[in-house]
From Swiss-Prot:
Tree of life domain: Bacteria
First-listed, main subcellular location of the protein, grouped into a coarse class: periplasm
Name this protein carries in UniProt: Tol-Pal system protein TolB
Subcellular location: Periplasm
A single GO cellular-component term on record: periplasmic space
Gene3D superfamilies: TolB, C-terminal domain, TolB, N-terminal domain
A Pfam family annotated for this UniProt entry: PD40
Residue spans crossing the bilayer: none
Family classification: Belongs to the TolB family.
InterPro entries tied to this protein: 6-blade_b-propeller_TolB-like, PD40, Tol-Pal_TolB, TolB_N
Keywords, alphabetical: Cell cycle, Cell division, Periplasm, Signal
Organism: Ralstonia nicotianae (strain ATCC BAA-1114 / GMI1000) (Ralstonia solanacearum)
Length: 432
């Protein structure tokens, strides 16, 4: 969080393995989702209970329905408990008459310790199939399968890739105990990656989603670690003199930008992913911090007070102009925490407005700025992998919560713990 700063390639199979072995313990504190706003135009869809689903330990269709509703783009048509297999084709006219523009039927079959899940998506207006999938998963992977089904439906009907099968990282605090946690995108299935009596901040996902870089104070000073979520092993990648903070991965996963005070005032540096090859990028008499790579890896956006107050700047990472910065934000007197959308078109950041800190997005092509929230303590923005939502931390009703808002500001979600606080969110990449 910037306000505190001023004060002080694997395959899908490996991903599935990650979900099984990442944790050193299962978190007891799960995030709960509350819809605070929905899109103005919603797609009515009927998702029947899958044949054979009642015999398995996970309610797949309930997860699919919840995923789609949470996106703000869908409304569920009541199926009144109907059980419909993936074949033969259902009576689409009957579902159309109930108000459904799309319909999903499916079948779950158990084969030993594995489950085959087949489903088919239909357009009720055209009376035709839009395709489907056949997934084979173990018992511990059924939630993932449900998210994958929701992703398929979302992409077929909306046209954008879904992010339901992605993961979140965040830091919870209960009493004096901090935990770095990894959960499903809906906040369910939380796993503990690290527990500490000292603060953990600034988690950042590697592009392939198998590692998280973060800052830990367990050595009584900020040190940057990289945590391998598959093996559970971690390594120090920056423990220079002074503060080591704000890790950010390059898009190719080979480099990590960090903010270091080793030479006096905090500046932006770059190291290889194993901690070797330290290289200084900025050379100013100001505080330069919070680096964030552009999607093509050619630029870094960062926060600097070189103009007298914190603003966001951009600099090339290579070539003769490397380290030469240009100011990006001009609206507002205090702007921090830059994050660039996956398509490189939007910049999310936190702006101080009066005494409040609010999430804004700036169109990088024309400089237009839009406020997205009505809360006053926003921090740590992070784009979803499809660029359609931004996850951030804030306070609602006196509670520290996570929130997600669509980039048009129409759809909002609140994710909170029943006890303790939750902060420092980061939205993980697409599964590869």
């Amino acid at each position: 969080m910037m306000r505190n700063v001023w004060k002080s390639g694997l395959r899908r199979s490996a991903w599935i393995g990650l979900l099984m072995v990442l944790c050193v313990g299962v978190a007891r504190a799960q995030l709960y989702v509350e819809i605070a706003g929905a899109g103005s135009s919603q797609y009515p869809i009927a998702i029947a209970n899958f044949q054979g689903e009642s015999q398995i330990p996970q309610d797949i269709t309930a997860i699919v329905r919840a995923d789609l509703v949470h996106s703000g783009r869908f409304s569920n048509v009541d199926v009144a408990g109907a059980v419909v297999p993936d074949s033969p084709a259902p009576d689409l006219g009957a579902w159309k008459s109930r108000g459904a523009a799309a319909f999903v039927g499916g079948t779950v079959t158990r084969n030993g310790d594995r489950y085959e899940i087949r489903f088919r998506l239909y357009d009720t207006a055209k009376g035709e199939s839009l395709g489907g999938l056949a997934l084979t998963r173990g018992e511990g992977q059924l939630r993932l399968a449900a998210h994958e089904i929701a992703d398929y439906i979302y992409q077929k009907l909306i046209g954008d890739r879904g992010v339901f099968a992605t993961r979140l990282s965040y830091v919870s605090k209960v009493g004096r105990r901090y935990q770095l946690q990894i959960s499903d995108s809906d906040g369910a299935n939380p796993q503990v990656a690290l527990t500490s009596n000292e603060p953990i901040i600034s988690p950042a996902w590697s592009p392939d989603g198998t590692k998280v870089a973060y800052v830990s104070f367990e050595s009584r000073k900020p040190v940057v670690y990289v945590h391998d979520l598959i093996s559970g092993r971690r390594a120090v990648i920056s423990n220079q003199k002074g503060n080591n903070s704000a890790p950010a991965w390059s898009p190719d996963g080979r480099r990590v930008a960090v903010a270091l005070s080793r030479d006096g005032n905090t500046q932006i540096y770059q190291v290889n992913a194993d901690g070797s090859g330290l290289r200084r990028l900025t050379r100013s008499s100001a505080i330069d911090t919070e680096p964030s790579f552009s999607p093509d890896g050619r630029s870094i956006y960062f926060t600097s007070d070189r103009g007298g107050a914190p603003q966001i700047y951009r600099m090339p990472t290579e070539g003769e102009d490397a380290g030469s910065a240009q100011r990006v934000t001009f609206k507002g007197g205090y702007n921090t925490s830059p994050r660039v959308s996956p398509d490189g078109k939007l910049l999310a950041y936190i702006s101080r407005v009066g005494g409040a800190f609010k999430l804004y997005v700036q169109d990088l092509s024309n400089g237009d700025v839009t406020g997205l929230t009505d809360t006053s303590y926003d921090e740590s923005p992070s784009f979803a992998a499809n660029g359609k939502f931004i996850l951030y931390a804030t306070r609602v009703g006196g509670r520290s919560v996570l929130a997600a808002v669509s980039t048009d500001g129409r759809t909002r979600q609140i994710l909170s713990l029943q006890a303790g606080t939750v902060r420092e969110p980061a939205w993980g990449p697409f599964m590869q």
